[in-house]
Regions:
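Aromatic- and glycine-rich beta-strand/loop motifs that create alpha-glucan
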Residues: 1-16
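Short cytosolic juxtamembrane segments of multi-pass membrane proteins
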Residues: 247-251
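Helix-capping/transition residues at the boundaries of transmembrane alpha-helices
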Residues: 8, 69, 80-82, 147, ...
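Hydrophobic/aromatic residues in alpha-helical transmembrane segments
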Residues: 57-64, 77, 112, 146, ...
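Helix-loop-helix units of permease transmembrane domains in multi-pass membrane transporters
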Residues: 2, 66-99, 246
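Terminal transmembrane helical anchor/hairpin motif
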Residues: 35-38, 158, 163-244
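Residues that define the loop-to-transmembrane-helix transition and helix capping
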Residues: 16, 77, 88, 157-160
């Protein structure tokens, strides 16, 4: 199942996405010296990783939300679940297949990004960038799990909207918690605490701003390990929920 998803998605415009990333980086490298003469290196470092994240997010959301609904709409899900394959294998196969695509996509974009840094003679810390990219992959893999979870029980359009909402709220979940404390309103504070517990704290997996300053700017190895474990655990919980919901659906 995972290999089928991988082959299907890889041949479905992934090369165009990589080409688009390369083109945007080339344009940015050309125009940044004209608009930010003294800080173009730092901006390009930030921009390259941020663009990777945006592209990975788009692929995760739009492909992930449609993986299950496409099978349902085409009625091929009936054939698949009739085979000696459990519904849990169906969900996890979809997840790991798309995660493999995202891994290939992120790896390829990273190689291209590092190539541009070399061409432009922009100093960078290879270790910090690779760690940031690894955590970026964990983040978009988590969003992949969110997308598949919503796609297991809603329409593709609603799943896209809900997944983007989770992404946006997940990036400001710590700010929501601080806002609740500052409000000094028990009702608002309880609401923001509940949202923080439910929503993924995606800021734990976002290291792009620190990575450009080198390893010394990154969290400690213990904090990195805990944050990586958090991302993996949250993704596993989402998959468990998706499997539970999908196993109760009738076709």
């Amino acid at each position: 199942m995972a290999s089928n998803v991988f082959q299907e998605v890889i041949r479905d415009r992934i090369l165009y996405i990589i080409g688009f990333y390369t083109l945007i980086l080339a344009v940015a490298m050309r125009i940044l010296p004209e608009i930010a003469a003294s800080t173009e290196g730092k901006i390009f470092l930030d921009f390259g990783i941020a663009l990777m994240g945006v592209i990975g997010l788009i692929v995760s959301v739009f492909v992930g939300t449609g993986l299950i609904n496409k099978e349902i709409e085409k009625r091929t899900v009936l054939v698949l679940i009739a085979k000696p394959i459990s519904r849990s294998e169906f969900i996890t196969g979809k997840y790991f297949g798309l995660s493999a695509v995202l891994a290939v996509l992120v790896t390829t974009m990273t190689v291209i990004y590092l190539g541009f840094l070399q061409i432009a003679h922009i100093p960078y810390g290879i270790a910090s960038i690779l760690i940031a990219v690894l955590f970026l992959f964990l983040q978009i893999s988590l969003i992949n799990a969110v997308a598949i979870s919503f796609g297991s029980f809603t329409s593709s359009l609603l799943a896209v909207i809900l997944t983007f909402a989770v992404y946006l709220m997940g990036n400001i979940s710590q700010d929501l918690l601080k806002f609740g404390r500052l409000s000094q309103n028990p009702g608002i504070e309880h609401l923001t605490q509940a949202l923080y517990l439910i929503l993924p704290d995606l800021s734990r997996l976002d290291l792009k701003n620190q990575a450009v300053y080198g390893l010394q700017a990154l969290p400690s190895p213990t904090a990195l390990a805990m944050n990586a474990g958090y991302g993996l655990l949250y993704s596993s919980m989402l998959l468990a929920i998706a499997i539970l919901i999908f196993s109760r659906r009738e076709f």
